[in-house]
Structure formats: structure tokens, C-alpha cells
Amino acid sequence: MYFQLVKLNRYYLGLGSNEDARLTHIQTAIFELNEQQINVLSCSALYENEAQGFSGKAFYNACIAIDTALSSRELLQRCLSLELSHGRARTHAPATYQDRPLDIDLLLGPDSMNDSDLTLPHPRMAQRRFVLEPLREVAAALKDLQNLDEIELLLSQCRDDSTLSPVNIRLLCSYTDLWKNSEMVVIEGCIGVGKTSLCNQLAARYSIDTHLERFESNPYLSHFYQDPEAYALPTELHFLADRQQALHELNEKKGIVADYHISKSALFAQLNLNPQDLALFNRFYSWSKKLTKAPGLYVLLDAPVEQLEKRIKQRARSYESQIDSAYLERIRSAYLKGHTSEEAQLVIDTTHLDFVNEQADFDRICDQINHLLLAQRLTNHNLA
């Protein structure tokens, strides 16, 4: 078997936006580039500056470095298509500037070019401090000394004295970086809905850690399904203690996807305990909740009971063999009613989704979660 080595070319791109959600356009474009046969290596700081060459709104600008096997023309077409998907309509009129949601320019490439469609290096970058400053940052971060020397020379000769104001947020290179810099994402839902499967898939795609429920460590669980009245309290207290201890150890960690949170204990206690036992349980739960950090994002999976029963039967866990449809319906209803107040909640109806076996279904779920994670990051930086 022979493997053909693919030559990767290094490019530097400039990104700008002065319309709508400027940061969202730029950050999303970087993520999208990274998933199109392109590896985003480094991002500069984000800067705000006044529009140049026309009277318009202030711009956000940044530069990135990428490696790709695409040719310069192929890369240009990717960038133009991405601009179009963000609502940019380029004009063919010479030297015409206007407000735009997304602007992507090829600044430097492996070879010089000069034709009607593309010129490298970019013919006007030497006149623009908002290009040269972030470009220098990226070249320095990659220790690209040859380009760095040329950029430093251009900066020393640049007559552009406009002010660049740093924006207080770090641009990320990929969705993997977004997950690694996000607070814990919790995937919950009824028994058999696919929480653990989705957690494992997300962890594999974004190279993050999982934190999964340890059902087998609860010695009362199998007895509970045989005699719920006798074993409900010890079962729920054991789960509460186990969850609180495990989650408390993760309070300061990021980049984790979990298939439960401490609120799961309250939900099942409400379902399974009599009033007297529930009062005792709530005393321990109140203390445990204070010691546990809220999740960054709470995702609730839902499915009809018929599907849940089918999945439970397929995985054939002995301690789940006694679960009946009425109990599943109570749990499902409790989740749908009880978590409407969770912050940053996303409810996903999996009735017609097979995210384990269908890539498109899994991609759709990832898109929904990624959208919320990015929105949450911008909100936390007061930049939404």
C-alpha cells in the first residue's frame, strides 16, 4: 500500500466585519474555514478601527494563519463562497467600499501572484495598519521569521496612523477550541434516550473529556427496580452522594461533557420518594447543590416512550429489565416540565434522529450545540 504525501501551503488571511453581529461573523467564519480542508493554525487579537476609504461603521479586524492543500484560486473561491453565505455581495466596481458583514482577504501565500482575480501579496496591505498589526502577531506566534521581517519593515514604513483598539476576547481556531474553553456541557433526558452515546460521540469529535454516570456502583439500584418502596431512599441518597462528590471535583474544569448533573437527583427523588423520605432527602440535596457549579450548557434529549423501551431492550442491562412504560412516561414528563427554567437550555427531539448511525443527524445536533456555546461565550464577554 502506498501513501501519497500531500503538500500543505501556508497562507495568511485577513478577516473583517462592520455589519450586524461583527464578532459572530468573524469567529464563525474562522470555524467554518477550519472545516473546509483547511487547518487554522493561529489567530491574532481582534481589533476595532474606523472604516477607511468610505464613511461607514467601525470594523472588527483580525488575521489568521492557515495550512491547506488547496491552491490559491481554490482557497479564494472558498473565501468568496463563505462571504456570500454570511450575506456579503461583492461589487465589481473598482475601488468601491461599503459596509459588509464579512470580508476575507488573502494576504500572503507560498508564491507571488498577479492577475485580474488575485494578487499575492495583497496589493494594499502595506497601506493598512489594521492588517499589518494583527498579521505581525500571527507571523510571530508561528515564528515565521522570513515573513515577520518583511511585515516589520512594512509597518515601519506605513503612513496609516489610525487607531486600533483591542477587543477583550480571544479568537478561537476551531470548534474543538470552543469546547475546550467552555464550561461543562450536560446532556440529560429519560432512561434510554441516548445521553451517554451522545456524550461519547461529542468527546470523540472535539477531543474533550467525558464524565459519565456510574450506575453500576450503586448497590441499591437493582433492588429498587424489584421493590421501589423499600429501596427508593437509599438508592437516591447513594446517587446524590456519588454525583455531588464527582461533580464537585470538576467545578473548575472546562472542556467536559457529562450525562448528568446534580439536578437529576432532585427530579428522581420527586418521582420515587414518599413525602417523609423526600423531606429528609431535600436536606442533603440543598447542601449538595450549593457545592456544585451549574453547568455551562444544559441539553435535554427527548424521545417517545416506545423508542426508549426499544433502546433499553437493545442494551440489555439486567437492572433495567423491570422498568415499565408507565415509569418511563413519568420520567420523561418530569424532564420536560421540570427543566424549563434551566439556563441556556436546548431541547432536542430525537424522534426522527439516529445520531449514533447517521452522520447528518449527529452533525445537526453539533451545529445546534455549537451555536449556543458561541453565543454564550460572546454573552460572557458582553459582546453578544
Region roles according to the model:
Residues 198, 202:
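Hydrophobic positions on the alpha1 helix immediately C-terminal to the Walker A/P-loop
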Residues 170-182, 310-384:
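NTP-dependent small-molecule kinase module
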Residues 195:
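Conserved lysine of the Walker
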